[in-house]
């Protein structure tokens, strides 16, 4: 079975070697047919602490690394991000 790959935005980079990535998807409402945004947050492994808040990244499913981490960051998608750091 191939590994799942998702694209999302880094919403937190405060922890060591971990980033939180928010992945949004669009679903159609069952009754009304309206397109709705749904999102989910994933904890992903970032070995070198190189990804910052606001960047768009691609994450890949891996074997569990901890209680929450089962994903790792594989690449940066958007290099023109605007980080929220002061």
From Swiss-Prot:
Sorted alphabetically, which NCBIfam families does this protein's record hold? PRK05610.1, uS17_bact
| Domain of life, per lineage | Bacteria
One of this protein's Pfam families, by short name?
A: Ribosomal_S17
Gene Ontology annotations of biological process type: translation
Protein keywords: Ribonucleoprotein, Ribosomal protein, RNA-binding, rRNA-binding
Keyword RNA-binding, does the record have it?
A: yes
Assembly: Part of the 30S ribosomal subunit.
Q: Which family does it belong to?
A: Belongs to the universal ribosomal protein uS17 family.
Q: Which organism is it from?
A: Rhizorhabdus wittichii (strain DSM 6014 / CCUG 31198 / JCM 15750 / NBRC 105917 / EY 4224 / RW1) (Sphingomonas wittichii)
The record's listing under PANTHER family reads: 40S RIBOSOMAL PROTEIN S11 FAMILY MEMBER, SMALL RIBOSOMAL SUBUNIT PROTEIN US17M
Q: Do you know which Gene3D superfamilies this protein is assigned to?
A: Nucleic acid-binding proteins
- GO molecular-function term, one example from the UniProt record: rRNA binding
HAMAP family associated with the record: Ribosomal_uS17_B
What is one GO cellular-component annotation here? cytosolic small ribosomal subunit
The UniProt entry, under CDD domains, shows:
Ribosomal_uS17 (cd00364)
Protein name as catalogued: Small ribosomal subunit protein uS17
Q: What role does this protein play?
A: One of the primary rRNA binding proteins, it binds specifically to the 5'-end of 16S ribosomal RNA.
